From Swiss-Prot:
Its main location: membrane. Coiled coil: none annotated. One of its GO terms (molecular function) is ABC-type maltose transporter activity. The gene is malF. Belongs to the binding-protein-dependent transport system permease family. MalFG subfamily. GO terms for biological process: maltodextrin transmembrane transport. Pfam families: BPD_transp_1, MalF_N_TM, MalF_P2. GO terms for cellular component: maltose transport complex. The lineage of its organism: Bacteria, Pseudomonadati, Pseudomonadota, Gammaproteobacteria, Vibrionales. This is Maltose/maltodextrin transport system permease protein MalF. Residues 1-22, 70-81, 312-322, 402-434, 516-523 are cytoplasmic. Residues 46-49, 105-288, 346-378, 458-492 are periplasmic. It comes from Vibrio vulnificus (strain YJ016). The keyword Cell membrane applies. Residues 290-514 form the ABC transmembrane type-1 domain.
Amino acid sequence: MQSVQGTDAMTAPAASLPGSKKVFIKWALLGTVGLINGYATILMYSRGEVAFAMLTVILTALALYVFGSKKTYAHRYIYPGIAGMILFILFPLAYTVGLAFTNYSAKNQLSLDRAQSVLLDRTFQSGESYPFTLYKTDSGHRIVIKDGDVLLSTPEFVLGSAISDLDLSPVDTVSGTAEPIKTIVSNRTALSSIDLHFANGDDIRMSGLRKFAGVVPLYTMQADGETLKNNQTGELLKPNMDVGFYQAMDEAGNFVGNTVSPGFVVQIGTDNFERVWKDDGIKEPFISIFIWTVVFSILTVLLTLMIGLVLASVVQWEELKGRAIYRVLLILPYAVPAFISILIFKGLFNQSFGEINMVLNALFGISPSWFSDPIMAKSMVLIVNTWLGFPYMMILCMGLLKAIPEDLYEASAIDGANFVQNFTRVTLPLMIKPLTPLLIASFAFNFNNFVMIQLLTQGGPNMIGTSEPAGYTDLLVSYTYRIAFEGGGGQDFGLASAIATLIFLLVGALALLNLRFTKLSQN
């Protein structure tokens, strides 16, 4: 009995060892993940990316809790999906909505502190300039400037070291080899950080690739910590929190004159949304593009459904020979990547050399302006998008037609129903319910079909007299892209975010209406 107990006691630690290893490995991995993400969070926060730092903290803390606690064991399987939804849907959505209430643009990207430091680093030439030559010596380099007929040289120094101050002294001759301009260009940063001192106390700094000059700061920070004094003109500048720029002030304390770049990001409330409705140069194209977006989405869904349903009915016809070949040929447009098909059609519709215009000109003597006429451009977009979308609808309809019992058609034939009555009273009612969610999804996809517009027409032909770039074939999503990245007056991310927020609300409202309508029709 004692020997049995002794054996159990000896085998107990060995049995528990694998479990201990698993626990150790688990916490080692979790600790490593926590340390890496913690370090990344510190880096992001130190660089001013507070939103991304907070996102990293939330996802990391959630991961450590889910994978470290036994209570949340079941949630480990859904955490990747939840994390992906937060990372790729909720965070971009919240970030975009947040930008919509700021003046964030190509001109206003920095924080106030960063804009101040950029302005304080600016200098202007306040005195005489002196040509210089960089000489390479046996133990380093020396800078030689020419003051009239006098040569002044610095002591030898190591280029690229931490030296920032050098004294000038007269020399009769210069030893060493003059460096070429490419050496000065490659070491411009190091040379620009060196101050040269004359014997009388004057200082000069590098002001060009061949000159040193007396350089002083253009702006000086005042005692209040935010006012800048222009040392060249004497005017005072303060940050204008309404526009996000430093601007001069008059004696009464009012902002006057032009703003000084770079700008900084400020909260401007609903100004971007008000611009959409109050600025006719934005409102009119926005309304026009919104109407076209809805029409484009609806017509695309209807045309692809009609063509797909007709072709599905044809290839399902048992008396048709070679049905398998026809199915393969009709599905091919769906198998070819969309961007390749779009670029091919762009060449086919070329107004001067495209095959489509060549055929139309040979048969009817016409050459439509597919890319310069708004109506023809919209027609071309619908034609190409229908070509890309009908195979998908055909595949869906083929499956749904197979699911309809043949007994229903036999019963309708006994009642004397013709083909049209079979379609409207048997086929369509049985197909429309399972098709409705897919049609809604197709509508939502085409509502934001950016790739189609960008590759085929790039939104053109352009509208005339608009404040922001807009085209007749632009969808709301491509219109937003052009405002954000192709604006003639600079990239306006705040306005683009406001329009993107409106698009989100519009698509959400349309989706709710469609779902309500679907539920009512089913009831």
